Amino acid sequence: EGSGGSGSSGNFTTGSNIRMSSVTNTSNAGTGTGTGTGTGTATGTGTATGTGTSAGGTSAGGNASGNSGNPPPAFAITLTETLLNK
């Protein structure tokens, strides 16, 4: 803060013999300063983990079987005495 100078207007006399007193003017000048400081930090961490399993299915093989055809038909054999004696 500072103060200004002062001055005087001096004395003077009018024609009616009225004396004026001196007048002093002062002025004040003011200066102001201000500082503002702010700091901030922000930290964030994140992790994401995912696991998954899938079991495979099983498939049984088909069974294949076939018949080998029909057996030959039965037939009668007649044995004669001549064949048996040989």
Swiss-Prot record:
Phosphorylated with a circadian rhythmicity, probably by the double-time protein (dbt). Phosphorylation could be implicated in the stability of per monomer and in the formation of heterodimer per-tim. This is Period circadian protein. Residues 31-64 have a biased composition (Gly residues). The keyword Phosphoprotein applies. Residues 1-86 are annotated as: Disordered. It comes from the Eukaryota. Sequence repeats lie at residues 30-31, 32-33, 34-35, 36-37, 38-39, 40-41, 42-43, 44-45, 46-47, 48-49, 50-51, 52-53. It is found in: Nucleus; Cytoplasm, Perinuclear region. The gene is per. Keywords: Biological rhythms, Cytoplasm, Nucleus, Phosphoprotein, Repeat. Forms a heterodimer with timeless (TIM); the complex then translocates into the nucleus. The keyword Phosphoprotein applies. One of its GO terms (biological process) is rhythmic process. Residues 30-53 are annotated as: 12 X 2 AA approximate tandem repeats of G-T. The lineage of its organism: Eukaryota, Metazoa, Ecdysozoa, Arthropoda, Hexapoda. It comes from Drosophila robusta. GO terms for cellular component: nucleus; perinuclear region of cytoplasm. Its main location: nucleus. The run of Gly-Thr is implicated in the maintenance of circadian period at different temperatures. Deletion of the repeat leads to a shortening of the courtship song cycle period, and thus could be important for determining features of species-specific mating behavior. Essential for biological clock functions. Determines the period length of circadian and ultradian rhythms; an increase in PER dosage leads to shortened circadian rhythms and a decrease leads to lengthened circadian rhythms. Essential for the circadian rhythmicity of locomotor activity, eclosion behavior, and for the rhythmic component of the male courtship song that originates in the thoracic nervous system. The biological cycle depends on the rhythmic formation and nuclear localization of the TIM-PER complex. Light induces the degradation of TIM, which promotes elimination of PER.
